Amino acid sequence: MRSFRCASAEYMPDPHDRSDRFELIAACDEETLAGFANEVLEGDPPLSIRQDPRPKLLMQQVQEPVERRPFNLGEVVVTPAEVELGDTRGFAMVPGKNERAALSGAIVDAAVAANHERTPAIVESLQATGTRQRAQHRRSWAESRHTTVDFQTMEEQQ
């Protein structure tokens, strides 16, 4: 099971790393992905859809915190897509039912993997998505931190 490295405030996801890129594409908004996909396709490169974007159920697995064992939390709806852009394959899986974002994300993934001329702009946008995602995570953590229970303090009061 792969650990979620982005949970650390210091970790900066690398859009050139495919695993990180998958996470960033999944977090990116549909309009941004579609815009980049359209720009990549402007030159009419050979494109074949290897997996049509269709919503599916996926078992979401988390790690149980006490014994650190995998735990099936439940099924979630995701939309995967896979393309071949020239000789390069691209894949994306986005949360929910969103065929356009999944197909666009797969095209974006292939473009970055192939070092398309739009790669610098795509990478910059994905890095900005990662920065926003980390900031949101820090805000959420700060808001929920005051609900932490200190069991040692509770035991001392009894």
Report the location of each language-model feature.
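Solvent-exposed, charged interface segments at domain starts and junctions
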Residues: M1-R18, V83-M93, W141-R145
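Charge-rich, low-complexity N-terminal segments
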Residues: R2-D44
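Cysteine/selenocysteine-centered motifs that mediate thiol-based redox chemistry or coordinate metal-sulfur cofactors
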Residues: D14, A113-Q158
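Non-catalytic, beta-rich accessory domains that mediate macromolecular interactions or localization
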Residues: D20-E23, L73, T88-R89, K97-R100, ...
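Residue-level preference for alpha-helix termini and adjacent loops
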Residues: L24, S48, K56-L58, P70-V77, ...
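Structural signal for hydrophobic packing residues in well-ordered secondary-structure cores
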Residues: C28-P45, A111, N115, T119, ...
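Structured beta-strand/loop patches that form or line metal/cofactor-binding pockets in enzymes
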Residues: E39-L85, F91-A92
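A hydrophobic, small-residue-rich beta->alpha segment in the mid-to-C-terminal subdomain
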Residues: G86-E124
